[in-house]
Amino acid sequence: MLTRKQQELLLFIHERMKESGVPPSFDEMKDALDLASKSGIHRLITALEERGFIRRLPNRARALEVIKLPEAYSPSIQPRRGFSPSVIEGSLGKPQPAAAPAPAKPVADNGNSVSVPVMGRIAAGVPISAIQNNTHDIVVPADMLGSGEHYALEVKGDSMIDAGIFDGDTVIIRNGSTASPGDIVVALVDDEEATLKRFRRKGASIALEAANPAYETRIFGPDRVKVQGKLVGLIRRYH
């Protein structure tokens, strides 16, 4: 199964070769997928090659061959332009147009509770490809939120268990693009994969730190990580 970005790149290469007979340049691929650097394109091409979708032809510049396309290929699928907060769609169904998290809405209980949109699932483990979609709303105590816009995510994985965040929990996130060292954040890696981790700085780099010794801390250049919001609350259902 391909991630959204992998599929976008594969179809962009395929359509360009149909039009001109030659693959696009790395700069063209970077711009088409709205990535910050060509290193992200190199990683996507390597992943496509490992999965048997493309082949690099030796001793030739810009030499790529598309071997196969996804089974659900549609010519109408085009690389996205721009960026939006990213999580996995709750139903794992067809991606819907992205929309910014809506402000929390008061509910009819004397203003003590507010409704927060659940935007899907977030990885607390290995980062997972992500899209944004408002699946449903939940009601939370108003004093949990404070100021700003908020959204909720359902946790998938066990990498944050030592921080008290378990698989199946719902985390409440304050929307924002900045974080302080030690904050637990929603982080987008390479404009492709979303994960819930503790934010640290290692010199000029950014470290995404798990709260489970089974997972390694991952270090990235600052251009590869975008903060999507900070953890402000957690809801757990007992069955």
Curated annotation (Swiss-Prot):
Keyword Hydrolase part of the UniProt annotation:
yes
- Quick one: where's region Disordered? 80-108
Q: Which GO terms describe its molecular function?
A: DNA binding; serine-type endopeptidase activity
User: Which InterPro entries does the entry link to?
Assistant: LexA, LexA-like, LexA/Signal_pep-like_sf, LexA_DNA-bd_dom, LexA_repressor, Peptidase_S24_LexA, Peptidase_S24_S26A/B/C, WH-like_DNA-bd_sf
Q: Give the residues annotated as active site.
A: 159 (for autocatalytic cleavage activity), 197 (for autocatalytic cleavage activity)
DNA-binding region (UniProt annotation): 26-46
Q: Describe the family membership recorded for this protein in Swiss-Prot or TrEMBL.
A: Belongs to the peptidase S24 family.
Q: Supply the name of the protein.
A: LexA repressor
Name the encoding gene, please. Answer: lexA
